[in-house]
């Protein structure tokens, strides 16, 4: 088992911690704030626009300016994978005008709670009020 340290408890940090823990790693998140997902809480006017339900070709045509750069990321974990992740974790979602995907509850806090629950179930350790100022490699590794 490897130890994985993640700097920042936003949406990306929480997702990274879940997938790292699912792969059998000991995971720690270092978050400078008092809670996780602080910016996620305010997205979509507090409703949290989780993703877009359009097909991937439409997504690339309308959102991405450098398709080759983003191709592997978008196809490595698609918008449907995001929807499946949340529904499998117990958060029902709905699709609204413009193919925008929101939690059925219309509360971004439910998205954060779902991520936190997954992290807790996987044993992810969170260190609040922790600012990382420097990362140093020793003997060729971090």
Question: Language-model segments: what does each one mean?
Answer:
Residues 1, 96, 129:
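Phosphate-coordination loops involved in phosphoryl transfer and adenosine-cofactor binding
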Residues 2-29:
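N-terminal Rossmann-like FAD-binding beta1-loop-alpha1 element of flavoenzymes
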Residues 4-7, 27, 111, 123-124, ...:
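Hydrophobic aliphatic residue packing
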Residues 8-13, 37, 44-46, 129:
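Glycine-centered flexibility sites
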Residues 16, 39, 137:
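Short glycine-/acidic-enriched loop or helix-start segments at secondary-structure transitions
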Residues 32-125:
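Conserved N-terminal/central alpha/beta ligand/cofactor-binding core
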Residues 128-141:
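A conserved short coil-to-beta-strand element within the FAD-binding core of flavoproteins
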């Amino acid at each position: 088992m490897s130890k994985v340290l993640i700097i920042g408890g936003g949406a990306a940090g929480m997702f990274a911690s879940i997938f790292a823990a699912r792969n059998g790693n000991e995971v720690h998140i270092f978050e400078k704030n008092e809670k996780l997902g602080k910016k996620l809480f305010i997205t979509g006017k507090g409703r949290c626009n989780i993703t877009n339900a359009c097909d991937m070709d439409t997504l690339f045509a309308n959102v991405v300016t450098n398709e080759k750069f983003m191709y592997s990321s978008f196809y490595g974990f698609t918008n449907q994978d995001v929807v499946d992740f949340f529904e499998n974790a117990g958060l029902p979602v709905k699709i609204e005008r413009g193919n925008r995907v929101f939690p059925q509850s219309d509360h971004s806090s439910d998205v954060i709670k779902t991520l936190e629950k997954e992290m807790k179930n996987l044993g992810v350790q969170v260190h609040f009020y922790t600012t990382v100022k420097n990362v140093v490699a020793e003997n060729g590794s971090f």
